[in-house]
Amino acid sequence: MDPEGLAHLLPPATLAALADSWLREDCPGLNYVALVSGTAPSQAVLWAKSPGVLAGRPFLDAIFAQVNCQVSWFLPEGSKLVPVAKVAEVRGPAHCLLLGERVALNTLARCSGVASMAAAAVETARGTGWAGHVAGTRKTTPGFRLVEKYGLLVGGAAAHRYDLGGLVMVKDNHVMAAGGVKKAVRAARRAADFALKVEVECSSLQEAVEAAEAGADLVLLDNFRPEELHPTAATLKAQFPSVSVEASGGVRLDNLPQFCGPHIDVISLGMLTQAAPALDFSLKLFAEGATPVPHARRS
């Protein structure tokens, strides 16, 4: 999907609510430094100072809209950033612009970091000739999931399930609590009815076969070494060709190619969100008529 179109997935009311909550966290009461900056109309340039993929424009727009500022973008969503890049210009009252600055930078840096990591993983997987799905996981930052899931999409990865209601995933603890794979899957199948797919985490071929026999749509082969993963997936697919196979656990960028194979449909990586470094952005005010520069001028 075109990264520019992904913004339409984000409900405006949700964007506004998130922006409001982040701003309230940063300034729940008196903003003393507003007396320093004043209220004069001001302008600032958003600079990208590290390479990567630009992601998070809708969130930055929502943050600055909450503080009565306007954003003009110079680069589209999903752009490859080559530092130092002039990304956007923000205009508004000085105290409002600076009130939104840190929240906006944090959000854009995090979202772009996830998108950059996702893009690297997708490129690595495609380099092997594998055509399956590179996906994230539910290992996201509490309160920041929408930003991180959106970043995955901009980077070209699949978001996987957004929450517990998006897919019935039966994990090892569910199997333990239910008293076995078949009991757990049958209960999940009844709960899912026709509307949701059921995925089952399995640690052996026997569990995978039991899950498929009980009606699982997807089987997650968790923490399999590559030399075990591919024969297991091949055997399972031979018996149950309609069951999708996901590989997860211990997958990193450096070993991702080892997990790509003809019987693997999805490879999910928690590190896409857990290990993604934030990109470096800065916001610098400049005087009307002056040439913006990516560093503060000192007189």
Curated annotation (Swiss-Prot):
Quinolinate binds at residues 102, 138-139, 160-161, 171, 201, 222, 248-250, 270. GO terms for biological process: NAD biosynthetic process; quinolinate catabolic process. The modification Phosphothreonine is found at residue 291. It catalyses: nicotinate beta-D-ribonucleotide + CO2 + diphosphate = quinolinate + 5-phospho-alpha-D-ribose 1-diphosphate + 2 H(+). Its EC number is 2.4.2.19. Pathway: Cofactor biosynthesis; NAD(+) biosynthesis; nicotinate D-ribonucleotide from quinolinate: step 1/1. Keywords: Glycosyltransferase, Phosphoprotein, Pyridine nucleotide biosynthesis, Transferase. It comes from the Eukaryota. Transmembrane segments: none annotated. Belongs to the NadC/ModD family. Hexamer formed by 3 homodimers. This is Nicotinate-nucleotide pyrophosphorylase [carboxylating]. It comes from Bos taurus.
